[in-house]
Amino acid sequence: MASYIGRRKFLATLGGAAAAWPLAARAQQSVPMPVVGFLNGGSPDANRVAAFRRGLNETGYVEGHNVAIEYHWAEGQYDRLPALARDLVRRQVSVIAATSTPAAITARAATTTIPIVFTTSSDPVELGLVASLSRPSGNVTGATQLNIEVTPKRLEILHELLPTANVFALLVNPTNPYTEILSRNLQAAARSLGLQLHILQASTEHDFDAVFATLVKLRSGGLVIGGGEVFLDSRHGQLAALALRHAVPTIYQGRDFALAGGLMSYGGSTMDSYRVVGAYAGRILKGEKPADLPVQQTTKVELIINLKTARALGLEIPPTVIARADEVIE
């Protein structure tokens, strides 16, 4: 069931001292606190929320002090997003922070008047979120992590580790709107490397066992997990454990995957993207218009390698790859 975490309501007990408050101070207390709607297709994530709050803080907004936040999480059930978005519109929030690609598309369909700030791992122009990166137009702007664009690089890195393998696989969620773009990009990369690529699909946890059984049957050299995928991202620990259990070298976009025991991660900085969304939300609360705020591309890309997992898989990471790593987990 989708999660609702409502705005924090702070009640002050007014005693006799209230009569001595300056008139201006009392007037300030009566001004309604702006509300930001936080819409996400995944499960509650403290690190992402903290990054979003940091962005708000940069513009002078502190949750519970001068801004309230309505948290709506779909917990990987994308069909719940329309109802969650409609609820935020009904509440007339000041800004909607749509912090995943499915959430961004859903929010865009739900309102043309409430400002929307998104984060996505795909091309927001191709998704129809904005007219252009430099001039978004309308009520929508945000940040892109370029994770779709760097997915071919993940295949290159994996092949560099496994130069004798010629069969690889890509795991995607078929319900996500950018799966076709991702699959097309990686198929092109595989052809350029002379590799055979199989596309495997999972939209529920029940699909995972079949996916890894297929990988073993295909004798796949390694697995690339599709970037920018909220359902898969929220289950990075489970995927890391399955990859290790079935001895499948795997690479994904998020740092959390490598920290959870995955072999490698390579992708844009998710936390930086959430921070940008928070900062843009704050600027809009101060009066700026989404159409005047260009879509930001978070160009910071990180390669994380888990050497403990590599040893468990019997892999020796080439020194050239280790030298490029931003972080090595021993």
Protein language model features and the residues they cover:
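Short hydrophobic alpha-helices and adjacent helix-cap/hinge residues
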Residues: 1-330
